[in-house]
Amino acid sequence: MSNEEELILDYYAQAYRLEMFSYRMMGKLLETDNVHNRLKKNNITELYIYGGGYLGVQLYNVVKPYVDVKAIVDKSGNLSVNVKGIPVISLDKLRTVYKNEKIIITPIKYYKMIKKELVEFINEDNILYLGEFLEGVI
């Protein structure tokens, strides 16, 4: 196998792992009792959700009955899916309105990059990764 073929195979293996983890997280979000228990365990009463894609919108729908979801945060200030009635703000807006609430990061592929931006103005203890929130793992 050539180096180029190995790189392509590695790329597809990584993409497959990300897709499988996303699929597992979507399944975990269907376990509403678990989600409610995880909210209690993490003492979450107010929350921002980072990521306007499927995982962010699904998390919003599941936690909304239990906590005050301030908004979904997306760098662009828009949802990636067409859903009405969900408050969405940009990262720049979050910088001006944030008041020590928890934030759960839903984009799996870009978690580290997003966290790096958030720790500039948010205490690291208030930032959770979706996998960490749902399963206690990063």
Describe the function of each predicted region.
Residues 2-138:
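Hydrophobic, well-ordered beta-alpha structural blocks that scaffold small-molecule cofactor pockets
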